[in-house]
Amino acid sequence: MPCRDTAITLASRILSALWPAGHPRPLPPDPRILVLKPCCLGDVLMATAVVEALRRHWPTASIDFAVGRWSRPAVEHHPHLRRLIDCGRVGEGAYSWREWLELARRIRAGQYDLCLVLDRSPAMALLPALAGVPWRVGLDSAGRGIALTRRVPVIGLMHEVDLYLACVRALGIPTAGARPTFYPTPAARERVRGMIPAGRSVAVIHPAGGQNPGMALSAKRWPAPRYAEIARRLAQERRASVIIVGGPGDRELAEEVRHLAGELEHVHNMAGELSFDELGALLERAAVFVGNDTGAMHLAAAVGTPTVAVFGPSDPRRYGPYGAGHRAVWKPPECAPCFDRGRWNESCQRFRCIEAVSVEDVWQAISQVWPA
């Protein structure tokens, strides 16, 4: 563990003694609830499983979500949320103490009865205490759950969704069947309906990703020529309309994949043309999604689309597409997984983990989730 991490852990354990875990006053029948998860897109999507479980238990409670600007699209139109609290830059990389205190002020103004902290940062764990929230339940990673009244230890290997749901179970609330969700708006569905070619099934490919505020992880990207071969086979062997998606900065990569696939009539480059809401609507209509470990991968799983995800430095047992009907393709060498808490082995130049996954490995996974 780096020296900085060790220092943070020791300081967190000392400060935790100032706020021992306890039993605050009973929750009201319809509590005011805040879910705190500032970043990032995939993690925020996974946290929607908590929203589903809370809403099922408290049908008329007020549930708000504190999220950063980068990840806001993941929950912007969620029907089970009353409103969103803007975290600004807090939780998305570098931010000032003034910004952190301003977020505490916003949380205090909500007069919440309960806050679920789905973040490993001690700064996030401390926020609801500073804001005067009596019930504070959240993750306690290496003793960093400062000021939480109920601490859920991060121990062993567990999928991130199940870890978040453990915070709900710490309240005595059942979580069976809860999963991440995304609800495209009617306007997004209508626009996408007019963009999809008729007469063929739709397959979506996302060859980019690995980017979050303050982090770019190119090792998560499966090579473009292999995505091109998958696109070609989907168009020719499965007679699918293949749509390549990504952000505005991914258009060149998407065009490379389309060109290498042979620039077939049924392979389309839509990178940079869709909002997150519209991407969800497109994925909702797709027969299959193929992509890297990205927010788009979690979005595909959240709308119920059979998902094939290619993994390298990160661990699909923790971050893979959640639920039945999906496949994560991972052939880890002895050094994998090296991605941990937003960091990876930057000295790695060979990317053996992602290179080990062959076209045939991915094609077999596609055949499993989308039988011919």
Regions found by a protein language model. Give the residues of each.
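Catalytic machinery of carbohydrate-active enzymes
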Residues: M1-A372
